[in-house]
Every structure is written in structure tokens, then in C-alpha cells.
């Protein structure tokens, strides 16, 4: 089937596109052209040197006998293609060899001569590997390139979005008002200060929360009561209250070993005033007072010889101790507390030693050398040294640790072997009134200071007070834990031991305790002594019964004198020790009271302090030995005998007076408190007396000073008077008072130690209670807050029925379908999170620059004018704006006298060439060309290019139609911050701007009707008129236009002309807030008119001059916002084109 084609169609088939050639179709086309022009038979002469006629370099030499080849041009031309074909065949063969590796047989066949097929094969294999590697590298490179392109695309999208955000931020920044920024800055500062204060409050609250103690750290009234009134030493049989209640009973038991008898002494010689002993002795006091410890007998005796000074017997001499015989002595009743089980050790014979002097001078030692007793009339031994102490003998078992207290030692007596040649006389046991801490033994420092005591032998005077004390002691009886019902004492293990056996075990002389005497008989003898049964009281019988050799009795004045000296020395030492102990107790009490006062001022501490102000040591006045019940009397002047006998009457000689019954009952009630209220009152009652100790100490010191003064006066008066019948009674009374003072001092020490520990404990408890009260107060405040929140929640709680109904409702599937899935939400949340993180990162990066911008902005804002200064300027601006608005609405009109542009002025300042001085010269006229859509005088000028011109013409018409379709809405205002607003709509006349002449009078030359040359945007001069289709403008508008010259930059290039048109279009935007929002939503074609692709984009800028606003303006918005620079908003400028001629 044949068909026909035109040569054009055949040419299109031969060359369908660039780079593609169909040789057959081209061959057919060329032959058809040759036949059509009749050139098929024509010939072309060739020189033979053409390139396409050159044959291959491989020349096939003819063999011998062959004919020479005939050179044919056509054959030579065909050989060129044959050579190419052979080369292609060779390449195909080599490629086939490369694809399939040669076999072993092929390698053997090829291994001939210099051929190296194996080496070639190895090179081929390496080449393949290299090619494969390059292939992989290229594939990886392409993949990386694709990834980079993908990332670049994502980056481009991000940059586009960022540009939009930046533009939006710029718009927002343009709308920011300086006065609002000031308000926001002030609010921010206030909020910052509030946050700092809130942080401080939170820190303080955290510290307060940290100080809240735990429950176990809180102390209740019951725990405080248990800590104060419960003994912590279980092994001790006595506590504070037992010591308060039992000590008076122990004092009663001590009276059984008091002076058995005193004899009437006749004074026949004068007695000098005695010198009191000014020495302080140290001894060790146990920390606790075991029960029955105050009933020890310390027998002090003396052996009196004719013409010999009174001396101590070996049993009572310094350095010796009284044997604690468990058996009863003749004429005495067993006293509890004597079974101490001390091992008596022999001591070397005592030689002459110097004793403590009674007078300021030195006297011979008042005791003899152990051994044979010197005969009557012997001289006193010479001065010597104190006996060396072999070693310390151990303390009695069961005693606690000891402490050293400055007190008078009644005699550090050494255990000695009793002398069989002498029987101990009846001892004047005034030491039995002293409690157990006065038990003599070696001090810690090894001191051996002794006091010379006088032992009186013979009959005792019948003292009614002593008989009464004995009878009271017999009625009270011995303690049950130490004595059986039949009166036989028990040993430490609780077994009944015969007194005889015990006496032999303890090495007591048979003379003293060797006889077995029935306890009843012994008690009867104690009750009614036979020695005192006679009226005369013959001393001879008493001495005989005692078993001691009858010796000459000393004279009465010596006995009275020495007894008086001994009593005075005892009283002085006791007074000094009592004063020292009282001062130390007062100091400790002051320190404790200070600690208590320094404790946190809680309610309980305040009540305790107020209660403690009632008086110092009021409840313990009688117990501690103060007051008249303990022998303290006011200072009196001893005038006559009647006062002496009245003061020394037996009514003041009571050695043991029970404590105040009200006090004992209060203590018992305090200790037995059970309920919390009772314990609270007990603690307050006890604390009320702690602060009274210092004041009471002062009163005790004053009373003691009065007692010392009275004692000195009495002793002086007794020494001067020398009353024979009252000396013994006075000494006994003084001894009783001294014993009572000593017991009171010991009680003070015990109470001081116990109360000191309790004060420390109470101080710690007070601190803990104070913290607990603070924590409770804080928790109460938190509880109140929580309670208010609970009430608020109860008021705002959700209705249960409504909530249940909402829960019962089924979900709508269509509504659920329209909702996003969780995966999408999570993805969006992740993206938002990343975006927020990026924004925060950018914010942190640009924070410094923002701060600087804020500082500059604040500086600029601070330099703004005041509202009152801007009022005149505002009025002027409104007037100018009215004129400009009219000009913009009616359109620009040519003013020959106006300037040509921004850069060209009416007068140009130049300099003279010859003299170089400034000269003002008028500038020449200059054409100002602005783009206009309807500038063509005819549809197609002769010089215009058809395709390009038509395209531009169509695009201009479309742009003009779009600008007309925008539609300027009436009654629409533009939002320009706080500036004035105008309801009048502005018509955009920017596209009506034409070519203007800078000079000339429009009245003289009618530019509206005259035909002028106009330079078009395509660079071609056209003939046309200035006025538009609407007709000429009124004359008033032209005058206003001449008066107000609108600034316009010179348009030297095409871009400048377009920029000037866009700028004039941006000066008067016709959209109000509503219309602008609608136009923004309608799409980009409303906000950006169509433009030719060769022109740069037209930027829509905010208006430079705000529209008028209603008179009712917001307060604080009087500042005039500055218009941004036009040059900074337009963007970059392309390179300028050469100026138009």
C-alpha cells in the first residue's frame, strides 16, 4: 500500500527531535530533493584529499601474482565505513571475551610465543573488581545524592515556612505599640518581683517543713513526768523521794548511839577563850546514800592521866578507825549499818607526831605512843612525824564510786589491834549523829589530816533530852531488813549469826562483845542502866563494870576546856564545809536556772518560769536544814545568864525533826500522779522550785552567817563564864545542831545532783516540745487551708447523675470518624515538640540580640515626645493628610513647577571650573516615565515584536482587570494602631500615573489635549495624551497638587519604574481590617496582582501615612508611631540600567 508524504513531513520523520536521526528517512529525503531539483545527474569534482575518502591504515598488501587493485572513489568511500564496521566487530568480540572467562583449553591454545593469556586474565579479573567497586561507589553516591536532594527539599520547605513565619512576625512587630510595650515591661518587672518573693516564701516554707519533727521526737506531759520522777538506778534502794522521807528516820536511829552519859564537871580554874580550828579537811563522799548508812558509830575517847594533857586512845587516835563490831557493846543496843565487814589490819607503832595545833602556836601531840601507857605524871612525848600509811584499805562492799568534797573529816582513823591490857571505856559517840558519807577512810590524795577529839571516861550526866531521844529510838526500833524480831542482827547474806561468833570473827575483844547477852536483857539494860540508877552516880562502880583499871580522874576544868575546844573545832569545820557546799550548790542552781530560762519560750516554759518566781527553795527549806527547825536562829547579843540558859534550853536540842507534813504529802502526791493533768501539774509544781535555789542559797548564807556569829558569841561567853553545869548540855546541843546541819547539807548535795540531771533532761524536753508546738502550729495552718479547699471542692463538685448519664451515652461513629487517631496525635505532638524545641533554641540564640533590640527600643520610646507636644503636629498632619487623600483619590496631576523626583532638585549645586566656588544652576527638564496599562495608541505598532508584545499586552490587561475587581468598599476604616482613622475609602489611582514634565505651566500648555511622546515600558516611544479616559481633572485639584508635591524617586531603569508604581500603590491600600482579612483568605491572587515573568515581584507594604480616626481615642495612645523607611521594606534592588536619554 503506497501513500504520499510531503518533504516537510519526511524531514520531521528524518529528524524528529534534537539528537535523533533516522538515516534511511534522511537518505530518502535527500534523494527526493535531488530528484525534485534535477540534480541527480550532476557531478562534483573531488580532489581526493578529503578526510572521508581516507582509507584505513591497515593496507592489505597484494600477493605475488595478483593483479594490482584498481582505485575506485566509491570503493574508497565505502572502505571507510567497512573499517568502522570491522572495529565495531572487534569491540564486540572483545566484550564477549570479557563477559565469559576463557577455558583452560583456550588458555593453552593462546599460550604461544610471547602471549600471556593468564596474566591478561588476571588483569581482566582485577578490572572487573574495580568496575564492580566503582559501580557500588556510584550507586552509593547516587543514593547519597538522592538523600541530600530529599533533605534539601525538606529544608527548602522549612525555609519557606520560616519565611512565612518571619513575615508574620514582622507584621506583628509592625503592629506593636511602644506604649503597650512599656506597659508590658512594667507588668513583667512586677511579675518578676512577685516570682522572686514567691520563691523566697517557698524556700522559707521548705525550711519550715524540714524542721517538722517526727512523732517519736515529741514529748508528752506523761513522758516528762516519768523522766523526772522515775528512778533510773534500779540497784539503789533509795531515790529522791526515799531520801527525802527516810533521812529523818535515819537521824532518829542515830540517836541510839549518841552520848550515853555526861558527868557534872566542877570548874575550879579559869578557861581562856579557845581558838577555833581554821583548817578544811577533804574526804570522799559516796554518790548514793544506802539505807541505814547514817547509823555508824565513831567512838572518840581519850585517856586522862594525872598531870597529863588529854589524849586520844588508840581506838580514836588519828590514823585509826573504830572497829565496826557487829556484836552489841555493853550497855548499847544493836544499831543497823554497823555490819560493814571491814578487815582490820595491824599498823606499826605510832611514834611521836605533830598534830594540828589548836592555837596559832604548836602544842605536843595529844595522843600517846601505841604500847604501854605512860605512868601518871609522865611528860608528854616530844614532837615527831605523822605515821606513814602502809596502804589504803579497801572500801566497804556495796559502796558506789566516790567523789572528793571539801568537808571536815571527823577523823581518818586507821585500824589497829586492840590492846588486851586496856578495855575500851564507854565512848562519847557524838559521831553517830553524822550520816554515812562521814564514814572515815583514806582520802584520794592520801592526805591524813586529823582532828584531835577528846574521849571522856566516866559517868555521863543525866540529860533529859538524851533520855527522850533514846526512848524515841527504842520505840522506833531497828529496820526490819537488818534485825530479826527477837533483836538479833543479820549479816550481809541474810543468815542469823550469833553475836558471839560474829564478835570472834571480826576480832573484837572479848571484853567488849565477848559475853553472850540476851537481846532482851541487853535492851533492858539500855533502857534502865544500873550505873544511872543511883542518885550519886558513883563512878567507881561504872569503871569496874567496864573492866578497865581504875585510874585517877582528871580535874574538871581540863575536861570542860578540852570538850569545849573540840566542839568549837567541829562546829567551825562543819560551818566552813557547809558554806562551801552551799555555794557550789547555788552556782549549779543558777546555771540550771539560766539554762531553763534560755529554753524556747513555749507556753509550758513560760508558765514554769512564772510559777518559779514564787520564792527560792521554798518547799525544801526545812528538809535542807534552813529555818528554826534545824537550829538556825537570829543573831542575838548575849548579855546575861538568863539569855544563855534560855537559848541553850533543851527545846533547841532536838536532833531530828521530821520534814514538813504538807511537803511530804505533796511529794508523795507528785510521785503517784497517774492522769496526764496530774502529771502536768506535778511537773509545773516541781519546776516552780528550780529557779528558787539561788535566792534561797543567799538566804541560807545569811542565816549561816548569823549562826556562826551566835556560835562564836556563845562559845566566848561560855569560856568566860565557865558554867560547870551548862557546859556539857551546851556541847550536846551544839553537837546535835552540827549533826542536823551535816545531814541537811548531805541532803542538799543529793538533791542538787538529782535535780541537776533532771534539769538537763527537762531542758532537752522543753526544746523538743517547743519544736513540736511549732510543727503543730504549721500543721494546723495547713489543715485549715486543706479544709477550705475541701469546702471549695464540695461547692464545685460535679453532679454524679449528670456524669453517669454522660458516661452512659454511646459515642457517635460519624463524630469518631472525624476525630484524629492517637497515632496521628502522637505524631503531631512529636512534631510540635520538635518545633517548639527548635523555636526555644532559636529564642535562646537570639536572646542577646533581642535584649539589645529591647534596650534600643526602650531608649527610642523614652525619647518620644509628650502628648501635649504632638497635638499641633497632629493637627498639621491631619490637614496635610486631607490634601494628600484628595490628591490620591482624584489622581496626580502634572505640575510644571514641581520637582522631577527625589534625586533631582530645582536648583543644582555645582562648582565653578575656574574659581571653584559654589554656584546654583537650574536643572534641565527630565522625563519621568511610570508604567501604565493603557498607553498604546494602536493595537500593534510596526516596531513591536509580535509574540512578546502580545504576551505582555495580555498580562497588562489582566492586571488592570484584577485591580478593578478588588472593589473599594465604602464605610471601611483601616486599623492603624492608636492613630487616627478615616471612614472615607481611598481609590487606588497608582496605575494612572503617566509621563510627567517637571516644569511648565499647565494653563499655558494644555498637556491634557496635546499629543506628546511617551516612552513605553518596552523602550519604544509612542504618541499619546496625558489624560485618561475619564476626562480632564478639575482645576482645584491641580492647584492642590501643585501646592503639595508628592515625593517620588527617580525612575532611571525598568525596575525603578515598576518599584515606584508599586510604592504608590502601597501608600493608599483600600482595605480595612475586615476587607483585608477577607482578601487574605480569598487567596494570593487578591493580594498579589498578576505580573509578567520578566518583572520582579511587587511588594505590598503597609501604609506610610495613617488614616484619620474618630475623636474618641484610647488613653495613653498619643504617641505618633514612626513610619518605617521605604528603602528597608522594598528589598534588594537589581543593578541599575543605563539612564534614558
Swiss-Prot record:
Keyword Coiled coil set for record: yes
Bias (Basic and acidic residues) occurs at 468-553, 1124-1141
Superkingdom is Eukaryota
Q: Where is the composition biased (Pro residues)?
A: 417-427
Q: Coiled coil as a keyword?
A: yes
Membrane-spanning ranges: none
List where this protein forms a coiled coil. Answer: 74-101, 145-176, 757-810
Q: Where is this region: Disordered?
A: 296-339, 416-439, 455-561, 1105-1141
* Pfam families per the UniProt record, alphabetical: DUF4795
UniProt keywords, alphabetically: Coiled coil
PANTHER family (alphabetical): CHROMOSOME 16 OPEN READING FRAME 96
- Protein name (record): Uncharacterized protein C16orf96
Q: Which gene encodes it?
A: C16orf96
